[in-house]
């Protein structure tokens, strides 16, 4: 479903807002120049490092995003009653994951995780800036540490940092 038609931003590119078949909204964009985007940079603080979709129908979401963007399902982690946490792979790079939305939880949505050097400091900055930390800081498989939060206006986001040292 097209929620906002394709729109040009001079010198930047063209974007639109869509909703997938489960109703989850997201923006899609093509840059003004034919180059690989640097918005997703798994090892660079301040950039998106993980894209996580909680959806009502994991298989339909995998088919939709795979068919539109070429994302391939990768390995999976068994999450018990929630099913698989299925990794998304684009050109050999794991860019995120798709999971079933928990029953009774928030509605299906994308959560984008941005890199920070220190998750504890980042969590403190969220709270002192008027935001809310909903989950974390918590360690995830692989050792990275995350928080899931919202800003003072209620927009949700995630942060991810390297494993704590010391």
State where each predicted segment sits:
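Surface-exposed loop/turn and secondary-structure junction residues enriched for glycine/proline
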Residues: 12, 43, 72, 98-101, ...
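N-terminal beta-strand motif that seeds the catalytic metal site of vicinal oxygen chelate
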Residues: 29-63, 68-74, 109-112, 160-166
């Amino acid at each position: 479903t097209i929620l906002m038609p394709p729109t040009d931003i001079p010198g930047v590119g063209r974007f639109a807002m869509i909703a997938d078949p489960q109703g989850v909204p997201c923006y899609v964009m093509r840059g003004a120049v034919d180059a690989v985007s640097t918005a997703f940079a798994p090892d660079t603080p301040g950039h998106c490092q993980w894209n996580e979709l909680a959806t009502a129908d994991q298989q339909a979401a995998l088919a939709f995003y795979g068919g539109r963007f070429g994302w391939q399902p990768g390995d999976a982690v068994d999450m018990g009653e929630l099913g698989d946490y299925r990794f998304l792979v684009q050109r050999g790079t794991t860019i995120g994951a798709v999971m079933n939305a928990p029953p009774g939880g928030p509605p299906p949505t994308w959560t984008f995780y941005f890199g920070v050097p220190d998750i504890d400091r980042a969590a403190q900055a969220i709270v002192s800036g008027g935001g809310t930390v909903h989950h974390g800081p918590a360690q995830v498989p692989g050792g990275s540490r995350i928080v899931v939060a919202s800003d003072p206006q209620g927009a949700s986001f995630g942060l991810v940092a390297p494993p704590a040292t010391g």
